[in-house]
Amino acid sequence: LVAGFDYSFGSDKKVASDLETYFKGQVIVVPPVLDQGEKISSTRIRQAISSGQVKEAANLLGYPLSSRGIVVHGDARGRTIGFPTANLAPIDRTHLPQDGVYVVEVEVLGRRHRGMASVGKNSTFDGTELRFEANIFDFSKDIYGHTIQIFWLDKIREMVKFDSVEALVEQLRQDEIIARQWTR
C-alpha cells in the first residue's frame, strides 16, 4: 500500500503511518514533493486548472494537461470567419480549464498540430451553453466523429464579448500569432 505523508483515514483521522497497524502488507509512506517551497498535491493541481493556469498545472504534473473529445457539428461560425474549429464533446471526466483562449497541441489522426482552443459560452454570439472547441493550424481534414486529444500548453487570454464580429476576428488573428510563436 502506498500513501502520501499527509494521508489520513477513518473518523478519527488516523495518519498514514498508522496503516501498518491495520494492513498486513507493506506500507510505503511517500514524503512530500515540493515545488517553489509548496507541496505538490492534487488540490493544488486542480486549483491551477480551474483558474486557467495550465502551464503551472503541467509543471506540477510533469506533463501537459490533456482532454479528449469527439468532434461534433457546431454552428460553423468559425469557418465563416476564417477560423474553423473542431467542436468537441468531452469524453473523459477531466477538468476543463477555466473559460478562456489557450495555446494547445491537438493530436488528431495520429499526428500533433499546434492550435488554439477556447472554453466558454461564445458571448459575442449571445451563447448560453459551454463550448469546447479548437482551431487546428494548417489542418483541413474532415474529422467529424473522430476522437481528438487537446494538450493545454498556456493561456492566451480570458473570454471576452466583442462589440462586433470584425473585432473578434482581429483578436483571433492576434491570438493565432501568439499561439504559433509560443515556445515551452
Task: List the model feature ranges, each with a label.
Residues 2-84, 107, 163-167:
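Classical nucleotidyltransferase
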Residues 74-184:
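Phosphate/ribose-recognition catalytic cores of enzymes acting on nucleotide-derived substrates
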